[in-house]
């Protein structure tokens, strides 16, 4: 089993000094959702726990308001 020696992940929101993640910022939210519509976990993205909670809440609010889809396009 090969072990990866990639770069250390960092929280983008901490580096940029973001106070709170907004559900209306769709460009940011789309980068944390997979093609199937799932929220990408923090162990993959490197997002800190504080911002991961805010991110998931913002994505769920955007889904509820139909700004983001719940699932992918079933074709």
From Swiss-Prot:
PROSITE patterns: RIBOSOMAL_S18 (PS00057). It holds the Pfam family Ribosomal_S18. The keyword Ribosomal protein applies. One of its GO terms (biological process) is translation. It comes from the Bacteria. InterPro entries: Ribosomal_bS18, Ribosomal_bS18_CS, Ribosomal_bS18_sf. Keywords: Ribonucleoprotein, Ribosomal protein, RNA-binding, rRNA-binding. Part of the 30S ribosomal subunit. Forms a tight heterodimer with protein bS6. This is Small ribosomal subunit protein bS18. It comes from Hydrogenovibrio crunogenus (strain DSM 25203 / XCL-2).
